Amino acid sequence: SFRKEIKFNLNKLNLEKFLFWIEKEGAEKLHNKRIVNSIYFDNKKLSMYHDSVEGIIPRKKIRMRNYNKNNEFLFEKKISSQEGRFKTSKKILKYNEIIKSGHLDSQYGLCKPKIKVSYLRSYFTFKSFRITLDQNINYFKFEKNHSSKFAYKDSEFVAEIKGKNSNQDF
């Protein structure tokens, strides 16, 4: 089913205010923090990136993701449309094959790994919403030899509020 998502950046001062607010409002920890590693795919023109920056819909993100540095990877497509966002996810066994050959997408053509993002994610639940908070965000550029090279460490935090696509306001 489609869902709504609101994402925003927080600096250290705003982070403290945000954490105080969600605790005061009764948000509860959903489960333990996890390290999230995502490898994002795009075509040579970086069309998915540009569509995202420009807010074009429909659009999608294609990524491989794993948690806590285990060897189990998920292949995900996240579609944004007028109705909201929708994600498909399936376990993959041929990690190296997808990294080397890429993924042929009907909308964007051949997509290869472009960037790896790694961060520590905290999870909360509040009313019918799920809140995630990402910190220690590191970006790595994917190289032609399929390795990743450190590119940037983000000093900010990213919070996201996710809920079912209903009339209930965030």
Regions found by a protein language model. Name each.
Residues 1-170:
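Phosphate-end processing signature that detects enzymes handling 5′-triphosphorylated RNA
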